[in-house]
Curated annotation (Swiss-Prot):
It comes from the Eukaryota. GO terms for cellular component: cytosol. This is Histidine--tRNA ligase, cytoplasmic. It comes from Arabidopsis thaliana. PROSITE patterns: AA_TRNA_LIGASE_II (PS50862). Pfam families: HGTP_anticodon, tRNA-synt_His. One of its GO terms (molecular function) is histidine-tRNA ligase activity. GO terms for biological process: histidyl-tRNA aminoacylation.
Amino acid sequence: MAAERSSITLGGKGSSLSSSSVYNVASGVANVRIDSSAIERFSTRNVPSIKRSSFGIPQGLTNEETRASLAVLLNKLILSTSGPPSSSTARSVLPLKIVEILNLKAESLELGEIDVTEGENIVLEKSCASLIGICSIIDHKSTTLSQIVDSVAALSCEVTKADIASFSLLDSGDGNGDKDVIGVAGDLKVLLNGYKGTGKLEIEEISKIPWIHGKFRYVVKSVHADARRELNSGVKGGKTGSGNTGIGEALGTTLLPLLTAIKNLGVCSFLRAKLCFEKIVDENLKKCLSEKICVENENLKNSYKLAYTAHLEEDYCRFAHKLNECLGIVWRIVGLEAVAAFFALAGGELFVQKSGDADKEESKTDKKKKKNEKKAVVGKGTSLVIQFIKDRLVSNDAASDGDQMHSLMQCGEQILNLFNPEGRSFDSLLDKVKEIVESNENRRLPKLPKGTRDFAKEQMAVREKAFSIIQNVFKRHGATALDTPVFELRETLMGKYGEDSKLVYDIADQGGELCSLRYDLTVPFARYVAMNGITSFKRYQIAKVYRRDNPSKGRYREFYQCDFDIAGLFEPMGPDFEIVKILTELLDELEIGDYEVKLNHRKLLDGMLEICGVPPEKFRTICSSIDKLDKQSFEQVKKEMVEEKGLSSEIADRIGNFVKEKGAPLELLSKLRQEGSEFLDNQSSREALDELSIMFEALKRSKCSERIVFDLSLARGLDYYTGVIFEAVCIGAEVGSIGAGGRYDNLIGMFGTKQVPAVGMSLGIERVFNIMEELNEKQKQVIRPTETQVLVSIMVDNKLAEAAELVSQLWGAKINAEYLVSKRKEKHFNRAKESGIPWMVMVGEKELSGSFVTLKKLEKGSEEKEDQTCTRDRFVEELKKLL
């Protein structure tokens, strides 16, 4: 009994036509009907008509393509009635005739002559129905192929046992990777979950799968978008002859990359299939399948040439027809790859055994061979695909014939039919593959968002050590702690960071207010000072901030900042000196290696730019360019200043001469203040040099000036800096700046009525963590994840009460202690060794009966020979002495 055909309704309110619907009508699995509301919109006027010999559908199309053309034409006629009624509005006669033709289950379509009005003739002439119809078929088949082909490629990976480690390297985490290539690699890893071939053999045909398939996915999406638009666009035209001109060129432009992508996909599948053939034991089967796929490969080459020629000749309908032909060939090649992979993975032999040869006696060697072949499929996803194929073949009794070769060929034909988009079981296969990928996606281990990290065990120990040092330094300078909300009103943050404002994270669910995650700790501090009317405040804050950029090495989207700020009126340059001094103390005590603090003055920069002839309105944007000199050459920065920011080449060169200057603070300051210096003639730069003179003298007397480098190329891109600016970098470590800051006298005034001058610094603690971890690894220092001093070891099972009594006494004495109850002695020593615990309180059967404990000291995790015994009432006091 034939399956009941579904029905697709056109012209309903809010309805749209999809490529899948066109394909279903074209392939005869769905009828088409016109919504009653659409029929009412057709014209009922008696208007002159003309005879046409056809619907304007080119000769040489397949029956499927012709039906698709008629389906598109029908929709275009319906769409032409969407405007106000006129003499050009289509009548119902022609659409109903098309519906009648489409719903007939005829092998060939007899279109015949038709009578059309002027308006209907415009639709027939200008709708490009055939091109759009074929494009819809291509869209549907390409989309389904992109969903199936990865599962077939995964089977080939299983056969070849190729190394797929490169699949995990495609997503670099910097946001610059190809989304579709990464997506294919991800789906392959899901299908190959549990795969054991990694690290064995790198095969080019396997390694390039993500790129070939990813680019195919990308182009298919583009075709889908264009097909959807053209399917649901009406035909606009009248007596002037205007219409949807350029549709052919537009679709031809979209389809041409797909032709190349399809050809590459087919060639890649063909090469993988050849690798699979080598693993097939039956020589006759191997030869037969190899001949078939070689024929298809030659057909693909020829069809590709014909399609490309049609495109060059601007015959876009013939081009689409030939492209559709190429697509059909690639479908067959992919199907043959699936057949080859199935037989290579023992699916064919197992099927024959079940169907007809189960009664034959097998040798031990054959049984062992089959057992190993069963183990060949180790990927969870690929195992399910193989099992799905087996179930379909067995249920269809494909190998009932006694002739093994004939049975195998029948089996192969059924697999081909399974991978045929027009086959009855194809939808089941497609659903199964989607189910595998989606269900495995749910079970896939979660991963961290880009630019974030977890801290655990040793990392937390390093972090706590760093935070302790930092807090001690901050408190030493008389600061009080402050904590502010992790998010602020968006208006508070916007306009404070210059070009970096685009990196602020906005919160999706605003809860009635426009809020953003804090970008730094300085702006929230300024908001707090202004909001509370504070005129003098020295504070520190250690908290997380968030930046929506592509993180480089040592940089994150979520990271800690350790800030120290001084707000209020003090001795001139006193706070500036102290802030820089604090930064040097921090870096010295953290012991992260050699470093230098680059220092400059924003007024000196402004004076320099004024001297060079830069317009005042461009000062900030040019400073942002100068700030890139630590990462780019001057030629690159000059190109940006000239081509993007509108400076003349001469002005850029003058800036280049100045920003080369850097050196010891007092020496370079003396040079810049020499008689005849251009800086002395500029008020802004002269003020800066006077302030720097005071500060450099203070730094020299505090014995930290050797760490300071006076650098005119330091610009710091943030808008709110007004005076001294500085940045600390590690010498010899490519991790960028590890601390920075400067004076910002106007920022607090932006939030209140009082102008409160302020200066501050921020330590990039994430980079400090990385450096500390690397140094620990190089020096092979063992970092204890815990501070446990004593392990209470109850070496008898089911004695929790004993452990509770003893360990509670230690906790009561403020001794860091853990307990373990197990009769396995090695378990206790392993625990102590892994955690670096120096002392054990051991209680075994002997200790229980004698009411005493044994104290054992561990040196680097190994047992000391001399143990001490102690009564239960005195062991805590004894441990206090020993610790």
